[in-house]
Amino acid sequence: MTAAAPEAARSAAPQAMSEQHTATMEIIQKRELWRFWMLVFGFGILTGLVAIALFVHQVIQFGEGRPVGLPHQGESPRGSIVDRNGVLLAADRYFYEVSTTPNYFDDDEQRQQVADLLQGLAGIPALETFDLLRTFPDNLYLRLAESISMEAGHRILDEQERLADEPGIHPLLYITLTPAPQRYYPEQRVGAHLLGIMTMLKETTWRRGLYGVEGFYESYLRQRDGVGLTSKTTTPVSSLPADVRRYLPSVAGRDLILTIDRNVQWIAEEELARALELYKAQAGTIIVMEPKTGEVLAMANAPTFDPNAFIESDPAALQNPAVSAQYEPGSVFKIITAAAALDSGVVTPTQKLTDTGSIAVGQRVILNSDRAGHGQVDMTEALARSLNVITAQWSLLMGHRQFYQYIERFGFGKVTEIDLAGEVYGLTKKPGTLDWSLSDLGTNSFGQGLAVTPIQMANAVASIANGGKLMRPYVVKARVLDGAVQVTEPTVLGTTVRPEIAKELTEILVRVVEEGNQAAGVSGYRIAGKSGTAQIPTKEGYTEDDTIVTFVGYAPADDPQFVILVKLERPDASIWAGYTAAPTFAQVARRLFYYYNIPPDNIRLGADNTEQS
């Protein structure tokens, strides 16, 4: 089912080429008497003209003086991209490029004649065509229109066929039509950062994928294009037979089936847009993952753009913040420190430590966000109240060697290996280096002084949700070539914690949502998670009023079907994650429970099991 959509999306190109070739050959047959002598002359000077053309003008001017490379023949379709259910997300659609060799025209009368015909047949402005033909009379190649519809192109071909029956050579026969693909994203802004864009290589007509899936899978999606005859000849290119216009047959690109669910992507983008408006945030990211496999179900970013018209967008907005924007995560990172403390055995879930309200680590005194002490507290209370002092004690009990080993285990400070272009490493300090001090051991424990990407944070928490396996996150579910499907197998990168520790921490994080992050809860479901509010570092220090807020969690807690990360930048309505990112998480989770038809826990597990779990 999913392979059929890409095939349908690509069928237009070969058909268009075939129709043009058929029409061209019929014209050739009807002009057999004059073509022979023209071709004899053309073959005689062909080699010389190719050399001259490449030496004098590797880049030819056209239109308003814009450079363009000599055209290549028969660019074949790039592979299509569909979601996990076969919904088309990216494909090539075909237009005709209209070009000519200006010195075929004898005078202004012929130039005006063809200009008027092109306007009537294809809507190409006659005045612009006439001016181009007069301005560049000696060009080897001149593009008159970058793209016209297939229907308009067929009208020109039909008229050329009719004019071939008339005596002499009508100037319209000097017009060449070349099927030209353009990348089309039918869902427009949906998944724009994830998909990436298509761009033209400078001073060429060759297309290249940039960012996202298009960039990462460039070599896979790209086809081997036909290598065409790029020189001036003594006859119109459209009238040359195939063996003269010789080019290597194009090989179609391969198709990709994504792990993305278009409907889940839409939910994430809709809730992200709502959150930005409601909380007056400047930007944001929502990631939805399947923790057992590492499949990315949705990856939404805002502000976003339309990949069909990305030139109008801010260039900085084209990169995917989910993999390329690193930030200090704040207290959401306490999940990682807690997991490391439990797995290393330096604390137990019920063990209590004393919170005096401050602790000196190295040259720095660490305080709680509320500037208060809370006495004897266990891990659940420490996470629910988000106590910096207790978290720093956990890291001190582990020591710097063990603490940073766990950070590395969870995948921080290195790429996750997700199959998207532009992923960055994040930033973690290491003991023994010049930029590390003992105070970093304390501040890093609660997510300050290090930088992560949203995908790193989501994937690390997913490893707790799945029982301790760090998976390679991925967005391509399968590759399709000639009807054969190559499925991506989930990859385990390593172990973060033991399964029993993951289960213990999950129970703690459920209580954290119930006791400290109630805004993230959804009635009837046990959700594990935690919020984080991070001040934004500047040259002068940390800001007081500008924050980045995050909530990451998973559900249902006993058998997680999805992990959701919500990140909002500089919310103005409230600087706290509990009032912004947490309720946004709940909105996404609520809609996913409905979409995946996941019953409430008391129905799914039974009332007795719900009470015990």
What annotation goes with each model-predicted range?
Residues 1-310, 401-411, 521-522, 537-542, ...:
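Periplasmic/cell-envelope proteins involved in peptidoglycan metabolism and beta-lactam response
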Residues 16-19, 90, 233-247, 260, ...:
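Beta-lactam-recognizing serine transpeptidase/beta-lactamase-like catalytic domain environment
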